[in-house]
Amino acid sequence: MSTIDTKTSRGLLGKKLGMTQVWDENDTLIPVTVIEITPNVVTQVRTPEADGYNAVQIAYGQIDRRKVNKPSAGHFDKAGVTPRRHLTEVRTADAAEYSAGQELTVDGTFEAGQLVDVVGTSKSKGFAGVMKRHNFQGVSASHGAHRNHRKPGSIGASSTPSRVFKGMRMAGRMGGERVTVLNLKVQAIDAEKGLLLVKGAVPGARGRIVFVRNAVKGA
């Protein structure tokens, strides 16, 4: 059984462009999400000796140097790369094979037909009630129900326990959370344009940043 210290992982940051449809080799129309993945760069390699674990820090998205604070600017200078807007770490056992300043491309990291996981931030829906947020059934439309058809109902007992239990599903802010979709198939790769076509939907709105990695639970 592989652990986080022995497992080899690959991952890249990209931008969700939207959804479209493509035909496969069997003339079946496949819905796909288009993810733009311009080359990521390695900004730091973490080792057990220096950091206690193996990992690769990657960066994505150009940003004006004037908008970067001095500690971040020094970090990018040490890696020999221009400042980038987004950073993330990939825990992988083969981190020693990477070097600071190395470019990682979509065609060099993924291949058509493999399974990937996509991590993103779900669309924000604002303040939502329990029927929309938690799929509650609501209150009866008749039989004495009066102006409370979409209310949650009771949220706890009276004298015992005289409180509302933690985790009670109630109305509140919906969406805007980190979501991971597992085992999506890479339908196609356009290396020239830096595009990754993934079968199905991925979290987030158009233009949002997503993290694509090889499937951790894939067959």
Swiss-Prot record:
It holds the Pfam family Ribosomal_L3. Gene3D superfamilies: 3.30.160.810, Translation factors. InterPro entries: Ribosomal_uL3, Ribosomal_uL3_bac/org-type, Transl_B-barrel_sf. Transmembrane segments: none annotated. It comes from the Bacteria. Keywords: Ribonucleoprotein, Ribosomal protein, RNA-binding, rRNA-binding. GO terms for molecular function: rRNA binding; structural constituent of ribosome. GO terms for biological process: translation. Residues 140-163 are annotated as: Disordered. GO terms for cellular component: cytosolic large ribosomal subunit. Belongs to the universal ribosomal protein uL3 family. Part of the 50S ribosomal subunit. Forms a cluster with proteins L14 and L19. HAMAP family: Ribosomal_uL3_B (MF_01325_B). One of the primary rRNA binding proteins, it binds directly near the 3'-end of the 23S rRNA, where it nucleates assembly of the 50S subunit. This is Large ribosomal subunit protein uL3. It comes from Leifsonia xyli subsp. xyli (strain CTCB07).
